Design a protein with these regions (language model features):
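A short SAM/SAH-binding and catalytic strip from SAM-dependent methyltransferases
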Residues: 155-168
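A short acidic, Gly/Pro-enriched loop at the edge of an enzyme's catalytic core
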Residues: 144-156
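Class I (Rossmann-like) S-adenosyl-L-methionine-dependent methyltransferase catalytic domain
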Residues: 21-89, 94, 98-145, 167-172, ...
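Acidic, low-complexity intrinsically disordered segments
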Residues: 1-24
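A short glycine-rich, Lys/Arg-flanked "PGG" loop and its adjoining helix->strand segment in the class I
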Residues: 171-183
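Surface-exposed loop/turn positions
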Residues: 89, 150-152, 185
Length: 265
């Protein structure tokens, strides 16, 4: 980009710097306009599941309506990619929060019947039930079991859940997902993997060294869900042994997180 600006400017470093500033300013203006248009669309849709700002902060670092809306559109598209528009049975949204993915899935008639959700955030579940009339959601605990019977679901998906569970507890949670899935059922999950551990802006040199040594890291962080779990691909493969076949593993497949498609054995 700098080379292109320099060729266009042709008037030395000062002109190049001016064009760079102009480009950055225009990018900011475009982002602001996109955010404004999105929020206007949200306001016009009376059926939109839009929780208050304090609940939106529970599921992300930013509380804007546009961010909540766009993240839900993105995550729901990935769910439909894996499970289709007409899932063959019940599908669990493990870590549903206040409905970021749910809103978009409810645009499909089959998903309105197939969807079930649970979260440790009792406030978010209460809001969905009382303010939105959605009864297919439950409060779950920070430790197994989930409030469902064995083999209840044909599918499970979760976004940014294992990323906030200490790595030494990942195996027991994979065992729990195995329990609630029917034989042959599939799961879509995201984790902070090797590429995330290499992010110098996210982790200190000492944290990165510890990750390199043991293949996992639990880092204390501020936020609604304190703590960030980072796990190597080898660590995750070990945690899945005897429970799931790995259909797909993508580095940074869900933004900065790795995403996995698993099949229950």
């Amino acid at each position: 980009m700098k080379d292109l600006i320099a060729r266009l400017g042709g008037k030395g470093p000062a002109e190049t710097a001016r064009l760079e500033r102009l480009t950055r300013d225009q990018a900011k203006q475009i982002a602001w306009l996109e955010k404004l248009v999105t929020e206007l669309l949200i306001e016009q849709r009376g059926d939109c599941l839009m929780p208050p700002a304090e609940l939106r902060m529970h599921v992300g670092a930013r509380s804007s309506k546009a961010n909540f809306w766009n993240q839900g559109r993105d995550s729901s598209a990935r769910v439909i990619e894996v499970f289709g528009e007409t899932p063959p049975g019940l599908v669990l949204d493990w870590g549903c929060g206040s409905g970021r993915t749910l809103y978009w899935l409810h645009g499909h008639e089959a998903w309105r019947k197939a969807y079930r959700g649970c979260d440790v955030d009792a406030e978010a579940i209460r809001w969905l039930r009382k303010r939105q009339g959605i009864t297919a959601v439950e409060v779950c605990q920070t430790e197994p079991p989930l409030p469902y019977g064995e083999g209840t679901f044909c599918g499970v998906f979760s976004f940014s859940v294992l990323t906030h569970i200490p790595p030494e507890r990942h195996r027991v949670w994979y065992e729990e997902l195995h329990r609630v899935l029917a034989p042959g059922g599939r799961a879509y999950v995201t984790v902070n993997g090797d590429s995330r551990a290499a992010d110098q802006a996210a982790f200190t040199a000492a944290e990165q060294a510890l990750f390199a040594e043991q293949g996992w890291l639990w880092a204390d962080r501020e936020g609604h869900y304190k703590g960030a779990a980072v796990v190597s691909r080898a660590f995750t493969a070990k945690a899945l042994e005897g429970l799931f076949e790995l259909e797909r593993y993508r580095d940074a497949g869900y933004h900065q997180q790795d995403d996995l498609i698993l099949r229950r054995v």
